[in-house]
Amino acid sequence: MAALPTRRFGRTELEIPLLSLGGMRFQQSWTDLPAGEITAESQVNLEATLQRAVDRGLHHVETARHYGSSERQLGWALPRCLDDHRLLQSKVPPRANPADFEAELELTFERLNCQRLDLLAIHGINLPEHLEQTLRPSGCMDVVRRWQADGRIGHVGFSTHGPTDLITASCNSGAFDYVNLHWYYIRQDNSPALDAARDQDMGVFIISPTDKGGHLHTPSQRLLELCDPLHPIVFNDLFCLRDPRVHTISVGASCPGDLDLHLEAVSRLDEAADLIAPVSRGFSRQLSMP
């Protein structure tokens, strides 16, 4: 396959690959383990996954402060898997006390062993109070703006598992450059939020399309039949990526081979309309059956 296509990531003006490497499945643990407890086997697998991503053009790597050992392990791996086009993103949750938020931000930079993040997301604006903690005067966003002024953070966005109206309100605040949100074939209710992000010229990053999109990495036999001749991962990726409001989707790879079906989807993107239509009709017939 040729170089992975990119899309303009909204007003960030970054050219972001259609596939992003999500760092929530290749780490050893969901606990932030001490360095001495991370095994060589786990680290070798993470580095192999990262290197395959680099080789195939997944230049955007995304993790989070509360993804267990992910930040620490990536901090070791990134210098060993060099990428001149890398875009690094992490996510830190809002706090009632901005000093607590800044302390976690410092820890993210320490774990990742980096001097700058291209992208920082406020992690989990799921309730109105999370948005208020972020945007109020002297809140968490003021910390981010200071770090941006110091050149340590490029662009700021937010991630969310919250209701559509809250996501839309967060987009319409004008404070964020991009959004990480759920939207895929089996869950299209966030479409108004995609519209709001487009209207604000925000980058749009679809999170967890394989897991929350229907546990597509372990599909049922019935799901395989409904998506035939496509794998469910390929079908869902094509559904997401054919929408111009979407700029990139997360690939939460646990090992190098987990990239394969997503790469297949991108290679068939020009055929998306013809490939998706018969599968969608099959789903519609299934849903209409008594």
Language-model features, listed with the residues they occupy:
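Structured C-terminal cap/extension of enzyme domains
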Residues: 9, 54, 192-290
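Short beta->alpha linker loops
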Residues: 65, 69, 93, 161-162, ...
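N-terminal binding-site loop/beta-alpha segment at the start of enzyme catalytic domains
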Residues: 1-86
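Glycine/proline-rich, positively charged
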Residues: 30-38, 51, 96-192, 198-206, ...
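Short catalytic-loop micro-motif centered on adjacent basic/acidic residues
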Residues: 59-64, 90, 154-158, 178-181, ...
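Conserved, mostly hydrophobic/aromatic
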Residues: 9, 19-21, 61, 74, ...
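Alpha-helix-loop-beta-strand connector modules within alpha/beta enzyme cores
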Residues: 71-90, 140-151, 206
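Short hydrophobic/aromatic-enriched beta-strand-loop microsegments
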Residues: 84-88, 175-183, 269-277
